[in-house]
A protein has these predicted regions:
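Short loop/turn motifs at secondary-structure junctions
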Residues: 34, 66, 121-122, 162-166, ...
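Conserved alpha-helical substructure of the radical SAM core
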Residues: 1-74, 78-89, 93
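Conserved, mostly hydrophobic/aromatic
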Residues: 31, 149, 301
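Core AdoMet radical
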Residues: 22, 42-51, 65-80, 91-110, ...
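Radical SAM enzyme [4Fe-4S]-AdoMet core and its adjacent flexible, acidic
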Residues: 134-246
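Flexible mid-to-C-terminal extensions adjoining Fe-S/redox cofactors in radical SAM and related proteins
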Residues: 257-314
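Alpha-helical scaffolding segments of alpha/beta enzyme cores, especially the outer helices
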Residues: 57-60, 82-92, 113-116, 148-151, ...
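C-terminal accessory regions of radical SAM enzymes
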Residues: 233-267
Length: 314
């Protein structure tokens, strides 16, 4: 029994899937950045991407089942040739469409079309900006990324984002610590970005770093693995359990495989029925009531104020 399971047992809690609200599509590992905290291990040299035949099956499923939200992530999902078609299909089906954007992709050659495309389809942008100061951003995401991110945010503002279209930012701690209070940090971000750069955005989401992939490698290299897991376990908040995203989100890989969350996907903890299930094997109702696969990494979502792809939970 791992530390997360012990916490569930202590609090007499269990995790089961509820009605599906969000279909989260991870459509590849390729990215124009290679961030230190990235749980996907995304990078420019990664080649995994969504193939046209798989994309067509996913689009058929969206047309049939019309989930409330289609959340598209990666990598930099915009690098995938199937990205445009997925956005168009989900938008036409009446779904809220979310793009998890690293911002710098907007400044890459041949991607000048993105801001106008986003606004045309009223895509909600959730963009990573781990700090409102250059030092921390460049440390976590690479030299020059802060300045590019600011330019990209200003470009999005020019296309109505932060006003008529939703623009949210994401904060990750730089090191092995819990995020600060989300509402207080949001106020700091808004003041700094508006005063220094004239930037407007809607909400800030704080997300706890998952002890997997590159961040796990950093923890072990710094001999802080046990210390960080102990911090997460000691900060367990049972009030976060009811709002965990794995209850209502279905994560789908670029090959169509199913997972309870994107973090489980990176650990290959497939949803199975004797064998790994594909999206086109199921309906949303088929998943309701199924136990959620968990591991020690789940402590990151239940520590402190809780954590999810849309920020704090409790």
């Amino acid at each position: 029994m791992n530390r997360f399971e012990k916490q569930l047992q202590t609090h007499k809690a269990s995790l089961k899937r509820e009605a599906l609200l969000t279909l989260q599509l991870n459509i590849g590992r390729q990215c124009n950045q290679a961030c230190r905290h990235c749980h996907v291990d995304a990078a420019p040299w990664r080649t995994e991407t969504l193939a046209p035949d798989i994309a067509n099956r996913i689009k058929d499923w969206i047309r049939t089942h019309r989930p409330q939200t289609v959340d598209i992530t990666g990598g930099a999902p915009e690098l995938c040739p199937e990205f445009r078609g997925l956005v168009q299909t989900a938008s036409k089906a009446g779904c809220e469409v979310i793009d998890r954007c690293n911002l710098t992709i907007l400044l890459e050659d041949n991607f000048e079309w993105l801001p106008e495309f986003f606004s045309q389809h009223d895509v909600t942008i959730i963009a990573s900006l781990p700090c409102y100061q250059p030092k921390n951003v460049n440390h976590q995401r690479g030299g020059g990324v802060f300045d590019k991110s600011i330019r990209a945010l200003q470009l999005l503002n020019q296309h109505g984002y932060g006003e008529s279209h939703a623009l949210h930012l994401v904060y990750n701690p730089v090191g092995p610590s819990l995020p600060p209070d989300q509402s207080e940090l949001e106020a700091d971000y808004k003041e700094a970005l508006h005063c220094d750069f004239g930037i407007h955005f809607d909400r800030l989401f704080t997300i706890t770093n998952q002890p997997i992939a590159r961040f796990a490698e950093d923890l072990r290299r710094q001999d802080k693995w046990d210390e960080y897991l102990e911090l997460l376990s000691n900060s367990f908040n049972p009030e976060s359990l009811e709002s965990l995203m794995c209850r209502s989100t279905l994560s789908v890989s670029h090959e169509g495989d199913l997972f309870d969350c994107d973090f489980n996907q990176m650990l290959e903890l497939n949803i199975r029925n004797g064998k790994p299930l594909k999206l086109w094997d199921i309906t949303p109702a088929d998943l309701e009531g199924r136990p959620i696969l968990t591991g020690e990494h789940c402590l990151a979502c239940t520590a402190g104020s809780g954590s999810s792809c849309t920020g704090a939970l409790a």
